[in-house]
């Protein structure tokens, strides 16, 4: 498992599916077994105590992302208020019975992909594109077939990132695949999340970013 200190308040975990198996878990456990999900979470927090000076006390914002070869988990000290429904406000001081009940609810909401099946008409799918340099962003803005994308350009730690959303009322799976293929001609898929960019990045061009870049450059 990899542990990265993003900043004073945020830690990122990356655990590969192979590492999961070596720890006695499998993907089915993580997605559908709440007790196993909770056990994995506390294992990660216990390991964190030895790797980083990061106290999990107080409200936490926890975001889980499933990648091709593993799981990425962001743990941020924060007070959640109006941030949406992808996180859960949970105070952790020790793994006592009350905290475990809260973690159980947290993991059910964040690890269980079944909830994604209930997306409404206004929900969107998200993709983060990392550019090698700003010239690639300019080139992408002139590409065709991306007119209905919702895009916002950020600067974060010296790099440029495009937050791309696919409105579900305009993009089916085939259209999304085609759009992503075009996007990947100009950049790389990033492991960052829209939440991380919104919290810690700097907005260079707000929605619609590609249209504004094309207009100015």
Swiss-Prot record:
Function comment: Enables the recognition and targeting of unfolded and aggregated proteins to the ClpC protease or to other proteins involved in proteolysis.
Subunit structure: Homodimer.
Species whose genome carries this gene: Listeria monocytogenes serotype 4b (strain CLIP80459)
Molecular functions (GO terms): protein-macromolecule adaptor activity
Domain text: The N-terminal domain probably binds unfolded/aggregated proteins; the C-terminal domain interacts with ClpC.
Domain of life: Bacteria
Family the UniProt entry places it in: Belongs to the MecA family.
Full protein name: Adapter protein MecA
């Amino acid at each position: 498992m990899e542990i990265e200190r993003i900043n004073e308040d945020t830690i990122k975990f990356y655990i590969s599916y192979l590492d999961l198996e070596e720890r006695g878990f499998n993907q089915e456990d993580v997605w559908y077994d709440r007790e196993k999900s909770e056990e994995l979470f506390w294992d990660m927090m216990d390991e964190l105590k030895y790797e980083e000076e990061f106290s999990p006390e107080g409200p936490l914002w926890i975001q889980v992302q499933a990648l091709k070869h593993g799981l990425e988990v962001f743990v941020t000290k924060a007070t959640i208020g109006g941030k949406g429904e992808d996180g859960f406000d949970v105070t952790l001081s020790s793994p006592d019975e009350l905290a475990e009940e809260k973690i159980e609810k947290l993991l059910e909401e964040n690890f269980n992909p079944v909830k994604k099946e209930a997306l409404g008409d206004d929900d969107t799918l998200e993709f983060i594109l990392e550019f090698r340099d700003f010239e690639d962003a300019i080139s992408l803005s002139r590409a065709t077939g991306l007119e209905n994308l919702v895009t916002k350009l950020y600067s974060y730690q010296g790099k440029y990132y495009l937050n791309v959303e696919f409105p579900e009322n305009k993009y089916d799976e085939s259209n999304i695949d085609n759009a992503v293929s075009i996007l990947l001609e100009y950049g790389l898929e990033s492991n960052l999340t829209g939440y991380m960019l919104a919290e810690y990045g700097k907005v260079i061009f707000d929605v619609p970013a590609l249209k504004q870049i094309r207009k100015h450059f």
